[in-house]
Amino acid sequence: MAKKKKKSPSSIALNKQARRNYEFVETLEAGLVLKGTEVKSLRQGLVSFMDGYINFKEGEAWLVGIHIAPYDHAGYTQHEPDRPRKLLLHAREIEKLQSRVEQKGLTVVPVRLYFSRGKIKLEIALAKGRNVHNRKEELKRRDIARDTARQLANY
């Protein structure tokens, strides 16, 4: 029998603004507590990360500000699109994230939603905010790297 290839987790949505506005210090994988209609909407890709962030309340982590559009064929069991959703993390991970946010002034942002072995996972990042000056430096550095790669390809 042939070996099965490992599939890379398929992405549902990316938070492109997070990569632009923040510098990631550390990333983690978290599960989400979702309702059935939310899962069906996510399978269709009906999600918006625009104002999403992670909030800590009473020893739990909550995903706030993410919009999962209502599922078309749901009927009366429709979910609320903008409700806060609980993140599934170990207690020590929550404590570590919460302490680093309070002490170092970092923030926790959602980066990517994806399927992993049939479950929906959220990649979150402990991040430091970038100011306009840092973003411009990053763009310059990327342009220089692209130009050098182009010149090396010509030789």
From Swiss-Prot:
The keyword tRNA processing does not apply. The keyword RNA-binding applies. One of its GO terms (cellular component) is cytosol. Its main location: cytoplasm. Keywords: Cytoplasm, RNA-binding. One of its GO terms (biological process) is trans-translation. It comes from the Bacteria. One of its GO terms (molecular function) is RNA binding. It is found in: Cytoplasm. Belongs to the SmpB family. Required for rescue of stalled ribosomes mediated by trans-translation. Binds to transfer-messenger RNA (tmRNA), required for stable association of tmRNA with ribosomes. tmRNA and SmpB together mimic tRNA shape, replacing the anticodon stem-loop with SmpB. tmRNA is encoded by the ssrA gene; the 2 termini fold to resemble tRNA(Ala) and it encodes a 'tag peptide', a short internal open reading frame. During trans-translation Ala-aminoacylated tmRNA acts like a tRNA, entering the A-site of stalled ribosomes, displacing the stalled mRNA. HAMAP family: SmpB. This is SsrA-binding protein. It comes from Maridesulfovibrio salexigens (strain ATCC 14822 / DSM 2638 / NCIMB 8403 / VKM B-1763) (Desulfovibrio salexigens).
